[in-house]
């Protein structure tokens, strides 16, 4: 089973430790997803998890 179903459901569970919602990621990284949700500007380091959720404040 593909651990990242963002393309289908808009929700991505990465390694069971992080959830990325409202995004269009196509694959997952260990830290979370290789995308930032809408409203979260993309940063040089990508989308960084704060806690167990990637949200509009995920980018540092």
From Swiss-Prot:
Molecular function as annotated in GO: metal ion binding
Span list, region Alpha: 29-60
Binding site for a divalent metal cation 3: 14, 18, 23, 28
Residues covered by region (Beta): 1-28
Segment forming the signal sequence: none
Record-listed a divalent metal cation 4 binding positions: 32-33, 43, 47
Binding positions (a divalent metal cation 6): 36, 40, 43, 59
Protein residues bound to a divalent metal cation 5: 33, 35-36, 49
Sites where the protein binds a divalent metal cation 2: 6, 12, 14, 25
Keyword annotations: Metal-binding, Metal-thiolate cluster
Residues bound to a divalent metal cation 1: 4, 6, 20, 23
Binding site for a divalent metal cation 7: 49, 54, 58-59
Family: Belongs to the metallothionein superfamily. Type 1 family.
Function, in words: Metallothioneins have a high content of cysteine residues that bind various heavy metals.
Record remark: domains: Class I metallothioneins contain 2 metal-binding domains: four divalent ions are chelated within cluster A of the alpha domain and are coordinated via cysteinyl thiolate bridges to 11 cysteine ligands. Cluster B, the corresponding region within the beta domain, can ligate three divalent ions to 9 cysteines.
Name of the protein this chain belongs to: Metallothionein
Organism: Oreochromis aureus
Gene label: mt
